[in-house]
From Swiss-Prot:
pH dependence: Optimum pH is around 8.
Temperature-dependence annotation: Optimum temperature is slightly lower than 40 degrees Celsius.
Entry GO CC: cytosol
Cofactor list: Zn(2+)
Protein name, per record: Peptidase T
Binding annotation for Zn(2+) 1: 81, 143, 201
Family from the record: Belongs to the peptidase M20B family.
Subcellular localization(s) per the UniProt record: Cytoplasm
The organism of origin for this protein: Lactococcus lactis subsp. hordniae
EC number(s) per entry: 3.4.11.4
InterPro entries, sorted: ArgE/DapE_CS, Bact_exopeptidase_dim_dom, Peptidase_M20, Peptidase_M20_dimer, Peptidase_M20B
Amino acid sequence: MKYEKLLPRFLEYVKVNTRSDENSTTTPSTQALVEFAHKMGEDMKALGLKDVHYLESNGYVIGTIPANTDKKVRKIGLLAHLDTADFNAEGVNPQILENYDGESVIKLGDTEFTLDPKDFPSLKNYKGQTLVHTDGTTLLGSDDKSGVAEIMTLAEYLLNINPDFEHGEIRVGFGPDEEIGVGADKFDVADFDVDFAYTVDGGPLGELQYETFSAAGAVIEFQGKNVHPGTAKNTMVNALQLAIDYHNALPEFDRPEKTEGREGFFHLLKLDGTPEEARAQYIIRDHEEGKFNERKALMQEIADKMNAEFGQNRVKPVIKDQYYNMAQIIEKDMSIIDIAKKAMENLDIVPIIEPIRGGTDGSKISFMGLPTPNLFAGGENMHGRFEFVSVQTMEKAVDTLLEIIRLNNEVVK
């Protein structure tokens, strides 16, 4: 194995349950995330990172790999998140499959679930590689503990294995709650103090992403008028029926399961209630600012039309922006994309530069003034039992970070 401790480090991390909690009001959202951040801080100190500190204000643990060059080069930041998605993360039992043949069905532990190339055709890309997958009962946590392990392995390489590798100052940060969309809300750009950064939070080999969705969340409250159904004619207003009518007024094909590429959508996350009152929760996504604003306006227009028909405010939407397409910031200076692209090409990795059908912590951090595109970390089928990662892809992620650092040495501030 190219980096001896990369896989053991990853396996150690994924066994810790750091599932974030969207219902929490604390930062981080769970005590487990606080404890894991402190554990990462101790690991960072053990590797030799300097100025390692945990920020109570935002749950980030930050450390520094000091420069070993007199060149005035740009300071680079590397970021990954410690939490995992909303799927069982207790008792993660990673399975290792060496020299995968690229065509066999992979059994997930003792469960009835499998990784079948017919369902997951990307498996054919991993012929001859070592895969880490789940036992079918949990997620794996490659999102984003692959990124965490890769950054730590990079730090180990620079500080302990090849300390003569020339580099400027590098700042490392691990934070909470990316999966519930609030991880970067309190990020401290001044404390991180770098010229540009990357999140190592992408998927398959070669992903290089600087364009995300713009995102909003919507909560629609429906006020009904409940009476006995036996005498309901011309009197009852069923709040659940209002919710159904509202949803049906949205464009039929603008849903996640019917869109791809640059197409945006409305996504109904949750619907509950009674005939008296109901509540629907949506997310709104689009890459283009104009279309994003049109989607939000449409949700209000539907409510206004329904209320006008009743002559009462029975449909009450609350729409809040969550994050914006970071391309608006990154495109002002594409040098950090160019350097990452060149790094991959130098390593015979084909860069995959496509819009993210989602967001990253970098979306918010970029709008705080720190351009932060996203690099591949290796995971596939993330957020569930079918998640897996290639050890060789993780190694290439470390290689890519090293090559970015090497190329950055050629750019004098």
